[in-house]
């Protein structure tokens, strides 16, 4: 199969179950809302080493937010519900509560359960906090130096999908990078997903475990390293490929992740120099979802 002349390998991305929460961060301006959203999703590339996977989902205009202010939805994920509950409290408390003019609301539809993030945060008010309501949502109003911080009492959690992915293989590192940036920009049009790595792009793709060091949970994916293609017998890097980047996608459900993979691949295939699109799978060691590339089209 080819898309815009680019080979799409007959393979699949291996994704896995994860618990997700979706939060709407609003502020007095779009700029301030994005700053708060960025801070809240920091250090969230991979649960291999980070306490959560996190990223910005989409911009929400004032007409569609509870407080009629600009906002961004963010997605925060962890395989453990208990750890995700902890991360919500830490991230909302340390990065949104502290951000100028910011507020936080639940933005997850069809939640399987709710956690008391806002209720726990109210105690920062030291007895001066109040209960309130914004567009039918129960909130806690916490007095702060600059005015008030408003946070919804409960945040939803549900089962989502993490690890949707594809590899962009190109003639040069530059063309691979441009294609990766185009893919990430296209994925931003899909609600309910995020790309957790820096700029949405993975430079150092990994494999499960290690061939040499038993203390590692993950190590470099040597089969996809362009500098090793002439050094190892089982290299999967084509002769005419000298640049590879990976895009990883987490989302609220399988269909959203698959939609994001499709639009990302289509965007990448428009860039001159892109030779092939592949995906990462690990023999079932990672997760139960098999997102076949050909099925996306």
Swiss-Prot record:
Keywords: Acyltransferase, Cytoplasm, Methanogenesis, One-carbon metabolism, Transferase. Its main location: cytoplasm. The keyword Acyltransferase applies. Pathway: One-carbon metabolism; methanogenesis from CO(2); 5,10-methenyl-5,6,7,8-tetrahydromethanopterin from CO(2): step 2/3. One of its GO terms (molecular function) is formylmethanofuran-tetrahydromethanopterin N-formyltransferase activity. Its EC number is 2.3.1.101. The keyword Cell cycle does not apply. One of its GO terms (biological process) is one-carbon metabolic process. It catalyses: N-formylmethanofuran + 5,6,7,8-tetrahydromethanopterin + H(+) = N(5)-formyl-5,6,7,8-tetrahydromethanopterin + methanofuran. It is found in: Cytoplasm. It comes from the Archaea. GO terms for cellular component: cytoplasm. Catalyzes the reversible transfer of a formyl group from formylmethanofuran (formyl-MFR) to tetrahydromethanopterin (H(4)MPT) to produce 5-formyl tetrahydromethanopterin (5-formyl-H(4)MPT) and methanofuran (MFR). Belongs to the FTR family. Homotetramer. This is Formylmethanofuran--tetrahydromethanopterin formyltransferase. The lineage of its organism: Archaea, Methanobacteriati, Methanobacteriota, Methanomada group, Methanobacteria. The gene is ftr.
